[in-house]
Amino acid sequence: MADSIHHSQRAQGSNNFDVSELTNAFEQLMRNKRFHRLQEHSRARTHSPSPSPSQVSSPGPYAPPHPSRAPPPPPTAAPFQPPQYPQQPQQYPSNQSSMLQGLPIVPSPPQDQASLKFRNLLHVLSVTPTKYENPGLLDEALSLIPLDRLYSEAEEESQILQAQAASVGGRPEWGYQDCVIRSLLRWFKGSFFQFVNNPPCSRCFRPTIAQGNTPPLPDETARGATRVELYRCSEMSCGAYERFPRYSDVWQLLQSRRGRVGEWANCFSMFCRALGGRVRWVWNSEDYVWTEIYSEHQRRWVHVDACEGAWDQPRLYAEGWGRKMSYCIAFSIDGATDVTRRYVRSSAKHGAARNRAPEEVVHWVILEIRRKRRENLSKTDQKRLMKEDEREEKELRHYTASALAAELNNLLPQNQTTGRLDEQKTPVSRQEAAAEWLAASQRNSGHSGPDHSQGGR
């Protein structure tokens, strides 16, 4: 009888299970696990005996046989030639699980060719956001932005969020500066930049067919074209060729106002910087890029995808599109950060192999870029950025712990039909209601421009 009562009490407790309790327990378990691993590693290094001379000189189980017991030589006198195998590029075992679980990583400089190649790539990519600091470029961008419209929309949205928060006795979800960037996002996607798949024929405006790449012309190279795609008009009577330079220079993007994901993220990030925002340009190794903007109101970095018009939806790519991602590195004028854990919550489901370099090398390169970008800053700014790094690392670890806790909680029988309890793939919240209200008011006043973006990527 007592056993049945005890069993019913346990069942009742499981029904009232709180995910936050499991999250805290999991984080404590991981801290203890890391501590014990470090202790064992230190103990093993302290007590490991050094090999004696006899042990060093004694043959192992795979040592060559003694000459007296060696098989007779082959009848031919030709020297033995070992088989030659083609050289394979060095691959590293994927450290996705250890990276996402926040296990301690000791930074280590790159030693092999593959690690050095990845280090050079990250250093080249880290230069991109430094180009946004050109005062002439920022002034040119500001001259193209309808500031009065953006500030008016931001003020309206900010007041709506404040009223909604006051009605429930809470705090507004976003601050005024966040609303300014959100208004910029709507204008940039709807009125300024155009997505290009196959550029139309400039002679007859008919669709074109891809013909591959072609070398850039000197004029295109001077304007920052990294490569040029060639297209042929689909109309047989026309047959004209259309060139589509892929510009990386933001100056040129202000003139062309068209491109694909790379051009969208590059130009939009610069516009955010022109409005005074702290900006990150995020590179994904699976050929995608986007933007992060720092929210002073929430004291964290917010995901922004100008091409998709997405705001604060970091799980869009992995869980919304089903993409598997390995590296997501954010670059800014203050350094670099590996933000993969923000966009890949479940390494088993959505994580790709991280085998371009050991995790120790990746961490070392990240710190190297930070030191390079911050070496001329004041001690006060360096300390502020260091605290931000610590706060963000805590945030990223919480994402991983919460995702694992939610998966464990979903395994419980009473939660199998309730779905996920953590953050939604496309969060619906108060700011979306405010955005819908603003969009409706713009349609009524004829204020909003057309959306020139095309389908496809």
From Swiss-Prot:
Query: Its GO CC terms?
Result: cytosol; nucleus
The residue range of the signal peptide is: none
Residue spans of biased composition, Low complexity class: 87-98
Q: Which InterPro entries match?
A: Papain-like_cys_pep_sf, PNGase, Transglutaminase-like
Q: Any keyword Zinc?
A: yes
Q: Does the keyword Zinc apply?
A: yes
Q: Mind listing the GO molecular function terms for this protein?
A: metal ion binding; peptide-N4-(N-acetyl-beta-glucosaminyl)asparagine amidase activity
One of the GO BP terms on file? glycoprotein catabolic process
User: What are the start and end residues of every segment in region (Disordered)?
Assistant: 30-111, 410-457
Question: What are the record keywords, sorted?
Answer: Metal-binding, Zinc
Residues reported to bind Zn(2+): C201, C204, C233, C238
Ranges of compositional bias, category Pro residues: 61-86
The text of the family note is: Belongs to the transglutaminase-like superfamily. PNGase family.
Protein name listed in UniProt: Protein png1
What is the species of this protein?
Answer: Aspergillus oryzae (strain ATCC 42149 / RIB 40) (Yellow koji mold)
